[in-house]
């Protein structure tokens, strides 16, 4: 018993010593208050947070997302704001040799005071700020104050001082009362805060990411980089580069890397000098479990623990790593240059969307929102998201979820559709921003490529910006800006990627194929906007080629239940109403453009609610057409990322999911279009052609069934054949003369149903022989029944005639597992829905809408 007590006492002392030796953190998120700098009234504040959300919480402004309220809050960005808190530093923290104050994010121009002494001045929303504060901290109460300067007042003098203009095409300066003074280019701040063609102008400020005190004794791990030199099925060679801060010289430090449960361990012993030390621990892993995108395999993650011990000081850090090799293959071929990603030696067709921030007020984006956003991408078979350059480098949780779900990330640097003053202090600020974020994100297996910007290269060379001042007699201004442009995107940013994430591809701009020119379809990536912006017909998606489509899109409105959330008044329910025009930022013509396309491709909607539904079907059909065309064009084309996955506020936009998280038709249509096997019927030159597309790593064998039906279910022709398809290949598996298939039936009265069955799973698709507006859609008798399930109900629909785009809704947040689907005559379709509605409520609220009803 006595020995047991001695052992327990010794264990306790060891644990206590280890705890005392390890770094500690004290979060500073409590008891904040804020005020307008020129006024004296203090109000409670939330940290992390923003000025706008704090003003809303204190009922000083109304929700700017509701109706026209955005207009009434434009004064906020012209004011300075002060945030303040008082705190007591813990005794354990105060006992540490080094103590730093760390702000993970300050938006944007701020002075920080601790106990009335200025300790920090910031000018970049995207950087982490840390400063030594031990000498200033007191036992008892301490005062921390952050003075936020108006980004407008800081940057207007910069704009006024220049004889030339830096362009920023999406900056909604007029909405902010600044006329044409687009000052967003001067701030290292999220560009979309100043407005975009899908977002409001809400230029906010605040402590937008966590703030804390960090104290440590002796040593601290400041960074760990798992540099993967070689990853194959047989072995993985990894150099673990550990950065250690040491207060004083340490003659002997042991640095250890382990993967508990995986049988992986390695260590080195080294002396440490005062300051920053870099130590490398080599790992050699036999038969590694590699990380794959979700359709190619398992996205396996190792949990590595890096620890350092020197005397009585120690620190450790845990990092989840996916072992994989990834290349961006850009090889000269006879008809251009390839542009494809290769994962673990396998060519990968990128399927996904462009991602924008989930809110203008970023601290409101919870983990649950991130989870739904990424899960919704995975649910429709996406394997890549492009983090667009006008937003932010996302929170860690975003990349962690992509790692877990097997989704690659195309990561833009935060520059978009603008030209920036890239010289001097600005450029050094950008360099530090790049280093900060590359270091933070480089261990994520999901990071596939760093891209210099969004559309800046196109803007400078393709939109005429590079010759504007030459035409005005001042070519020297164009030369100045061109030099700055080249320095930022062709020197500073690629040098940062090479230095801090060697081996990760860098792409100068999106779209891009060469420096002095816009993108070419035979090389690089393409933003294809002739459909929509240039009013080209949707059918043009079938004939336009590119190596990689990194943007294309089509607009729609949110559904009716979503519209009611931000526009509940009946007078708003018109696409030309003031509210609907305010919640459309794609130009004053954009709502009319949806209507024009609708009337060109379908027919006029009879009322507002019908218009919303039809806009979904129109958008879904358009993007489905594009995705299938891109996939049929493999191996010329290797990527299809539509614009866009999400919204940052309630708005008519190109998003496949609205701001409330409701799926539009486009999102449902993306699931089969992005599946690992696609059967794709199309018509051209009087022939029906059926293509089979595989993204699988193995040969596929199965049965293809092609059936031509009349709308009442009468079979006009049927063909069944066995098909073998090589790995990662495309094959035309059926071709027939359309006239021979229809047997005299009008093209508008028939459909083609294609089904491919392999391994017990069926892949199907429906095609048409006539444009949608020429389809002779019949009146149909739809019947439905519902059976209770653990989550809600399973709803089964049947119809005596073909039904186009059946949409099930409950006018709530309920999500149907499938929707906007075509019903074949006499063939039942069962879909599940999660809901807590009683059976009586469900029966009363269920609404079934289909295209036949809209004429």
Residue ranges and their predicted role:
Residues 1-13, 20-384, 632-633, 637, ...:
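Secreted/periplasmic carbohydrate-active enzymes, especially glycoside hydrolases
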Residues 384-430, 520-526, 532-535:
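Aromatic-lined substrate-binding rim segments of carbohydrate-active enzymes
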Residues 26-29, 33-46, 192, 199-206, ...:
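Substrate-binding clefts and catalytic carboxylate motifs of secreted carbohydrate-active enzymes
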Residues 141, 348, 378-385, 403-408, ...:
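Loop/turn elements at helix/coil->beta-strand transitions in domains of secreted/extracellular proteins
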Residues 125, 197-200, 293, 354-367, ...:
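The substrate-binding groove and active-site-proximal loops of carbohydrate-active enzymes
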Residues 423-515, 660:
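Active-site neighborhood of glycoside hydrolase catalytic domains
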Residues 333-339, 395-397, 431-439, 533:
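Alpha-helical scaffolding within the catalytic cores
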Residues 351-353, 385-387, 409-411, 452, ...:
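Hydrophobic faces of well-ordered beta-strands that scaffold small-molecule active sites
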């Amino acid at each position: 018993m006595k020995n047991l007590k001695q052992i327990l006492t010794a264990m306790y002392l060891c644990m206590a010593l280890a705890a005392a030796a390890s770094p500690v953190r004290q979060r500073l998120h409590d008891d904040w208050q804020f005020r307008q700098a020129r006024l004296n009234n203090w109000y409670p504040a939330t940290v992390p947070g923003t000025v706008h959300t704090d003003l809303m919480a204190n009922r000083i402004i109304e929700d700017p997302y509701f109706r026209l309220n955005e207009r009434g809050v434009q004064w906020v960005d012209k004011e300075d704001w002060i945030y303040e808190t008082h705190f007591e530093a813990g005794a354990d923290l105060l006992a540490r040799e080094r103590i730093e104050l760390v702000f993970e994010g300050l938006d944007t121009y701020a002075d920080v005071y601790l106990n009335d002494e200025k300790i920090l001045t910031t000018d970049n929303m995207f950087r982490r700020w840390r400063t030594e504060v031990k000498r200033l901290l007191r036992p008892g109460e301490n005062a921390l104050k952050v003075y936020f300067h108006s980004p407008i007042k800081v940057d207007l003098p910069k704009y006024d001082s220049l004889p030339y203009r830096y362009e920023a095409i999406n900056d909604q300066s007029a909405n902010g009362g600044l006329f044409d003074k687009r000052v967003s280019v001067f701030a290292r701040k999220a560009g979309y805060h100043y407005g975009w063609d899908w977002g409001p102008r809400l230029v906010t400020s605040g402590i937008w990411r966590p703030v804390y005190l960090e104290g440590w004794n002796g040593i601290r791990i400041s960074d760990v980089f798992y540099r993967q030199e070689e990853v194959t099925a047989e072995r993985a060679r990894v150099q673990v580069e550990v950065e250690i801060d040491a207060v004083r010289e340490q003659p002997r430090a042991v640095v250890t890397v382990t993967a508990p449960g995986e049988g992986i361990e390695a260590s080195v012993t080294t002396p440490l000098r005062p300051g920053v030390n870099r130590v490398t621990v080599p790992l050699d892993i036999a038969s590694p479990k590699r990380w794959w995108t979700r359709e190619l395999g398992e996205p396996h993650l190792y949990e590595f623990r890096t620890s350092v011990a020197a005397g009585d000081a120690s620190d450790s850090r845990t990092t989840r790593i996916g072992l994989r090799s990834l290349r961006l293959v850009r090889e000269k071929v006879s008809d251009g240059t390839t542009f494809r990603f290769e994962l673990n030696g396998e060519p990968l067709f990128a399927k996904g969307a462009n991602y924008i921030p989930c809110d203008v007020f970023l601290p409101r984006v919870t983990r649950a929102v991130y989870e739904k956003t990424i899960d919704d991408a995975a649910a429709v078979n996406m394997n890549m998201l492009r983090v667009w350059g006008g937003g932010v480098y996302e929170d860690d949780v975003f990349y962690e979820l992509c790692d877990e779900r097997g989704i690659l990330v195309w990561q833009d640097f935060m520059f978009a559709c603008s030209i920036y003053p890239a010289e001097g202090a600005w450029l050094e600020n950008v360099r530090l921003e790049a280093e900060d974020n590359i270091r933070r994100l480089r261990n994520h297996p999901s990071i596939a490529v760093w891209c210099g910007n969004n559309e800046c290269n196109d803007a400078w060379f393709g939109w005429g910006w590079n010759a504007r001042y030459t035409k005005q007699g001042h070519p020297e201004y164009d030369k100045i800006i061109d030099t700055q442009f080249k320095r930022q995107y062709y020197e500073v940013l690629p040098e940062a990627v090479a230095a801090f994430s060697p081996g990760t591809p860098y792409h100068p701009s999106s779209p891009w194929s060469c420096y002095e020119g816009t993108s070419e379809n035979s090389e690089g990536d393409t933003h294809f906007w002739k459909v929509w912006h240039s009013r080209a017909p949707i059918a043009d998606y079938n004939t336009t080629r590119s190596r990689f489509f990194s943007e294309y899109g089509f607009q729609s409105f949110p559904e009716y239940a979503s519209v009611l959330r931000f526009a509940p008044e009946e007078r708003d329910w018109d696409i030309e109403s003031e509210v609907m025009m305010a919640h459309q930022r794609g130009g004053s013509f954009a709502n009319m453009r949806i209507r024009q396309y609708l009337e060109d491709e379908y027919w006029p909607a009879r009322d507002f609610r019908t218009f919303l539904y039809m806009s979904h079907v129109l958008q879904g059909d358009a993007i489905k057409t594009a995705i299938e065309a891109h996939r049929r064009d493999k191996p010329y084309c290797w990527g299809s990322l539509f614009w866009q996955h999400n919204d940052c506020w309630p708005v008519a936009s190109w998003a496949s999911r609205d701001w409330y998280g409701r799926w539009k038709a486009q999102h449902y249509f993306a699931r089969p279009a992005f599946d690992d096997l696609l059967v794709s019927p199309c018509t051209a030159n009087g022939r029906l052609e059926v293509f089979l597309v595989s993204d699988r790593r193995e040969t596929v064998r199965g049965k293809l069934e092609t059936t031509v039906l009349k709308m009442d279910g009468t079979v006009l022709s049927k063909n069944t054949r066995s098909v073998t398809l090589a790995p990662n290949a495309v094959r035309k598996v059926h071709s027939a003369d359309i006239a021979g298939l229809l047997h005299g039936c009008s093209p508008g009265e028939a459909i083609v149903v294609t089904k491919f069955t392999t391994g017990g799973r069926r892949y199907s698709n429906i095609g048409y022989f006539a444009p949608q507006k020429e389809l002779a859609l019949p009146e149909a008798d739809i019947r439905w029944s519902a059976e209770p399930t653990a989550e809600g109900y399973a709803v089964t629909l049947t119809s005596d005639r073909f039904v186009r785009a059946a949409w099930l809704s409950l006018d709530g947040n309920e999500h149907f597992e499938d929707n906007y689907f075509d019903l074949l005559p006499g063939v039942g379709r069962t879909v599940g829905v999660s809901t807590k509605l009683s059976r009586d409520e469900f029966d009363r609220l269920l609404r079934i809408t289909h295209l036949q009803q809209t004429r």
